[in-house]
From Swiss-Prot:
Assigned protein family: Belongs to the lyase 1 family. Argininosuccinate lyase subfamily.
One of the Pfam families matching this protein, by short name: Lyase_1
Catalytic activity: 2-(N(omega)-L-arginino)succinate = fumarate + L-arginine
Gene3D superfamilies: Fumarase/aspartase (C-terminal domain), Fumarase/aspartase (Central domain), Fumarase/aspartase (N-terminal domain)
Keywords for this protein: Amino-acid biosynthesis, Arginine biosynthesis, Cytoplasm, Lyase
Subcellular location: Cytoplasm
EC number, as in UniProt: 4.3.2.1
GO cellular component, one term: cytosol
Name recorded for this polypeptide: Argininosuccinate lyase
Regions crossing the membrane: none
Pathway: Amino-acid biosynthesis; L-arginine biosynthesis; L-arginine from L-ornithine and carbamoyl phosphate: step 3/3
GO MF annotations, alphabetized: argininosuccinate lyase activity
Length: 494
């Protein structure tokens, strides 16, 4: 039976199954198993290159690591007797090649810098995956907006009819929010993409290691210099989770509106059957369950972020085992966010919008009253607050006509007819399309403004796609080079 080689020496006896399970991080370690092997390979290459380890043991250990990389880490490495995947892999390796050769892999490092490196390596990949999903969601929203620049709908504040807008304008509000989410994710990526490898337990090492070499071979853009900070910080995970929490808050708002819009009371959108469920008792039901689950997942991601912050709060320097408890929250939050965004993009791209009903609702609830007040300012020279009062009184009377406006203006001792107000001008202002086109400022709902916004966001989507693709290529190239050099070492000394 293979034993945990890390535990041997200082400690004696065998832990109970409950204690072993309590300490083990095996479930979360599945996320970083592949990264751990790559970190081992890079570290071993560096030890050989620096003359710290001889060719024969280097080649023997590399042979096993390359097999783990190609075939996957054996399931035995995740056994609960091992505190973590790092101990599991090292124990399996020593069992295969012997401690004289396999026992040299851990020279010049600790599990502290090893796990921090693995977390960063895998998180970099996940941030690019989520970034790609967010960019794809933006692309869906921008594409839909392009189809609906003339689709008039009511805009709401406090869930009440407020002002007319267009479906394109509404969709672009989400596209812009998600584009900021992408900016945050890519900015966080730059800080995650630093290597702590070589920091060892916290005080670095007396061996002549080359931290820049391992950083480059693993695709990192640089080294996290201070060795104590390198192993003890988890701010990179906190930042990633915070980004995901904000992202999911934005997604939950979109989900909430789609749920409301798909209701029998509103009927603005019909979701594709693939994103709905039915009732076990009510045969007519088509429920937006996927979006409801996504709305709930937003709470889970917020919870993961809060839990991670609470775990790190007030921890003394440097490494503390508390940090192990943060990792499951990281992967849970990352996984929920990525899946949610991909599913939301699918739900939107397959949805059918009821633009006729939207247009019917656009003029209800006196939603054109703001444009009417604005027109009275422009045409009659009234102060806006005065026009606001007049229109508000007319709304209270139950109608918006020249007659109701003139009656409402008597309290202000104003003769609207003398100021040039006509029924034709009133009716024009009450037309939702007229009010929309009047709002042609940057970011407004007018067709020209929306078209400009679409072009801007299309360029943003294109830039995001390019940035992610370039970074993926850079990382893939680095790992390809790493494996190539590892194979060269193995074959050269066999």
């Amino acid at each position: 039976m293979i034993h945990d080689v890390v535990r041997e020496g200082r400690l004696s006896g065998v832990r109970s199954g409950e204690v072993a399970a309590f300490l083990s991080s095996r479930n979360a370690d599945h996320w970083i198993a592949e990264a751990d092997v790559l970190v081992d390979i890079a570290h071993l290459l560096m030890l050989y290159r620096q003359g710290i380890i001889e060719p024969e043991p280097a080649a023997a250990v590399m042979d096993v690591l390359l097999r783990f990389s190609a075939d996957g880490v054996p399931e035995e490495a995740f056994d609960e007797q091992f505190e973590d995947i790092h101990a599991g892999i090292e124990s399996l390796l020593i069992a295969e090649v012997g401690i004289e050769q396999g026992g040299r892999l851990h020279i010049g490092r600790s599990r502290n810098d090893e796990v921090a490196t693995c977390l960063r390596l895998r998180l970099c990949e996940e941030l690019l995956v989520i970034g790609d999903a967010v960019n794809g969601l933006c692309e869906v929203l921008v594409s839909l907006a392009g189809e609906h620049t003339h689709s008039v709908m009511p805009g709401f504040t406090h869930l009440q009819h407020a002002q007319p807008t267009t479906l394109a304008h509404h969709l672009l509000s989400y596209a812009q929010a998600f584009s900021r989410d992408l900016e945050r994710l890519l900015s966080t990526y730059q800080r995650v993409n630093r290597s702590p490898l070589g920091a060892a337990a916290f005080a670095s090492t007396g061996y002549p290691i080359d931290r820049e070499f391992t950083a480059t071979m693993l695709g990192f853009s640089g080294v996290l210099e201070n060795s104590m900070d390198a192993v003890s910080t988890r701010d990179f995970a906190l930042e990633a989770l915070a980004d995901c929490a904000i992202l999911m808050v934005n997604a939950s708002r979109c989900c909430e509106e789609l749920i409301l819009w798909s209701s029998s009371l509103v009927r603005f959108v019909q979701l594709d059957d693939a994103y709905c469920s039915t009732s076990s008792i009510m045969p007519q039901k088509k429920n937006p369950d996927t979006l409801e689950i996504m709305r709930a997942r937003a709470g889970s991601v917020i919870g993961a972020s809060t839990a991670a912050l609470s775990i790190v709060k007030a921890l003394p320097m440097s490494y503390n085992r508390d940090l192990q408890q943060l990792t499951p929250h990281l992967w849970e939050g990352i996984g929920d966010a990525g899946a949610s965004i991909r599913i939301l993009a699918g739900a939107l791209s397959t949805a059918t919008f009821n633009t006729e009903r939207m247009e019917t609702e656009a003029g209800r609830g006196f939603s054109t009253a703001t444009e009417l007040a604005d027109m009275m300012v422009r045409e009659c020279g009234l102060p806006f607050r005065t026009a606001h009062h007049i229109v508000g009184r007319a709304v209270r009377s139950g109608s918006l006509t020249l007659v109701s406006l003139k009656k409402a203006a008597t309290g202000e001792s104003i003769d609207l007819t003398a100021l040039g107000l006509t029924e034709e001008k009133v009716q024009a202002a009450l037309d939702p399309v007229h009010g929309i086109e009047a709002r042609s400022v940057l970011g407004g709902p007018a067709v020209a403004s929306v078209s400009t916004a679409i072009e801007t966001l299309q360029e943003s989507v294109k830039a995001g796609r390019t940035a992610i693709a370039e970074e993926r290529y850079r990382r893939t190239t680095a790992i390809t080079t790493l494996i190539k050099e590892a194979r060269r070492l193995k074959t050269f000394h066999q």
